[in-house]
UniProtKB/Swiss-Prot annotation:
It is an enzyme of class 3 (hydrolase). Keywords: Carbohydrate metabolism, Hydrolase. Pathway: Amino-sugar metabolism; N-acetylneuraminate degradation; D-fructose 6-phosphate from N-acetylneuraminate: step 5/5. One of its GO terms (biological process) is glucosamine catabolic process. The lineage of its organism: Bacteria, Bacillati, Actinomycetota, Actinomycetes, Bifidobacteriales. GO terms for molecular function: glucosamine-6-phosphate deaminase activity; identical protein binding. The gene is nagB. It catalyses: alpha-D-glucosamine 6-phosphate + H2O = beta-D-fructose 6-phosphate + NH4(+). Pfam families: Glucosamine_iso. Its EC number is 3.5.99.6. InterPro entries: Glc/Gal-6P_isomerase, Glucosamine6P_isomerase, Glucosamine6P_isomerase_CS, NagB/RpiA_transferase-like. This is Glucosamine-6-phosphate deaminase. Belongs to the glucosamine/galactosamine-6-phosphate isomerase family. NagB subfamily.
Amino acid sequence: MPEIIIVKNEAEAGEIYGRCVADLIKAKPDAVLGLATGSSPLAAYQALAKIVKDEAIDVSGVRGFALDEYIGLPLTHPESYHATIHRTVVEPLGLDPAKVHVPGDVLNGTPLEDGDKVALAGPAYDRAIEAAGGIDVQILGIGTDGHVGFNEPGSSLASGTRVKTLAEQTRVDNARFFDNDINQVPTHCITQGIGTIMKARHLVLLAFGAGKAEAIEETVEGGLSAFCPASALQMHPHATIIVDEEAASRLRHKDYYRYAYTHKPAWQGI
C-alpha cells in the first residue's frame, strides 16, 4: 500500500519531493533519477533546484532517465520530451546533459514506419537503465484515466519500454502544447512500461486538482487493474502518493492517511 500524503498545494508537495531527492543525492552523488514531464512535477523540480542551490549540492554525478517520448518529433522540437526535460530539469538543476536520457534519444525524429529502428529502442532503453544500476527515485504524474507515462488503460502491468498508440483523449489533452491543434500531436510514443517503472526503488506520484480525484480514488482504493495503470503502485514496496485536498476528495480513508503521516517518526522520511 502506498503512503498517502495530503498537502495544501503543489508548493508543499514540491518541498517534500525536493527534500527527499536532495538528501538522496547527498548520500549517493551518482543517484539515478526517474524524470517525468507535464505540469504536476514542475513545482517539485523547482523546489529541488532551490535546495541544490541553497545547500550547494554537487549534482555533477547525477544521472536521469525520462519516462517517455513522442515518436516522429526531432529532439530539437520544443515539445519533444528531450527538449522539455532539458528545459525544466537539466538546466535549472545544472545536471550534466550527457547523463540525462530520454527513450527517443536514439530515434531523433525517426518515423514510425522505420520499424527496425523503432522496435529496438525500447529494449535498449531498459538495458541502459539496468546498466546504470536502476532508478533510485521515479517521479510520476497521473492522467485523468489513471495512465502513468504513456501507459494508457489496458496496458500490461508487466510491460517494458515499448511503442504505444496514444489514446485520443491523451492527444486532445496534449493539444494545448501544440497550438491547440490535435493534428500536430503525434499519434504514437515510446514509453517506459509499468514493469519498468515498478523496478524503481522509490516511486513518488503527484496529483493535484479535482480532475484527478477519480483517478486517485481508483489508484489507491480501487482494485488492481490494467484499466487503471497507476493501480500497480499498490504492489510496490516503496511508493509515495502526494495529493492536494481536491485530488484526495474521493478517498474514503483520507482521515487515516492524514493521521498516519502526521504521526510517523521523522527518521522514516518518505
